[in-house]
């Protein structure tokens, strides 16, 4: 009976320690970061945005939450500007601005003690506005599309709080503009952006 009680106590102690350890391990993976950034976004392919603008450039801020082991969630907001290079294509409108949100999941790989790579897959929303040249108001449209990319991360301090992040991403853009001719509809509503970003990341 004494041996049975000792054995039972040992099992209870091991189980309690194991559960405590699992809980501790899970919470140890939770990390947050904030990323002020600058971006350049180039339209690719045969489409209205590629023919109308040189490129988009902007700045913004992002946040990441590492939830479990190497997986996490992130969001970025960027305010973009662009210059019109072909007024005939863009119509009676001035240079546009764009509000962009990128929502994504990421997986982080540790390459060395100071160097990491993040793989990203998510969804983007866009709101583009352009003033009419006669100052009578603004034209605006909203749209969205998938995004996927990769980030290279380098740690710049001994504690691991500060990092420099270089990213490249493909953003798919779909404005859903209808036309009886599907080629014209695709030309004015669909595009792919090649996105380059540079950010300072602070982890906490």
Where do the model's predicted regions map?
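Gram-negative (and chloroplast) outer-membrane scaffold detector with strong preference
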Residues: 32, 64-146, 152-160, 202
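Short glycine/proline- and aromatic-enriched beta-strand/turn motifs that initiate or cap beta-hairpins
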Residues: 19-76, 80, 201-203
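Structural signature of outer-membrane beta-barrel domains
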Residues: 41-45, 80-84, 124-128, 169-177, ...
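Predominantly the C-terminal beta-signal and adjacent terminal strand-loop region
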Residues: 148-204
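Bacterial Sec-dependent N-terminal signal peptides
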Residues: 1-24, 204
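Membrane-spanning beta-strands of outer-membrane beta-barrel proteins
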Residues: 54-58, 98-100, 143-147, 191-193
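Outer-membrane beta-barrel domain signature
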Residues: 25, 46-52, 88-94, 135-141, ...
């Amino acid at each position: 009976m004494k041996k049975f009680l000792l054995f039972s106590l040992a099992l209870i102690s091991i189980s309690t320690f194991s559960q405590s350890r699992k809980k501790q391990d899970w919470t140890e993976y939770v990390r947050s970061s904030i990323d002020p950034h600058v971006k350049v976004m180039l339209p690719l392919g045969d489409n209205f945005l590629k023919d109308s603008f040189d490129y988009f450039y902007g700045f913004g801020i992002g946040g990441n939450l590492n939830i479990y082991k190497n997986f996490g969630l992130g969001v970025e907001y960027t305010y973009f500007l662009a210059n019109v290079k072909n007024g005939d294509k863009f119509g009676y409108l001035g240079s546009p601005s764009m509000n962009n949100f990128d929502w994504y999941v990421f997986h982080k790989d540790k390459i060395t003690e100071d160097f990491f790579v993040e793989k990203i897959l998510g969804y983007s929303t866009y709101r583009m506005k352009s003033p009419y040249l006669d100052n009578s108001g603004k034209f605006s449209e909203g749209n969205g599309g998938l995004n996927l990319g990769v980030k290279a991360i380098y740690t710049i301090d001994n504690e691991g709080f500060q990092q420099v992040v270089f990213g490249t991403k493909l953003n798919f853009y779909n404005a859903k503009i209808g036309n009886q001719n599907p080629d014209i509809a695709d030309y004015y509503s669909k595009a792919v952006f090649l996105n380059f970003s540079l950010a300072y990341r602070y982890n906490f």
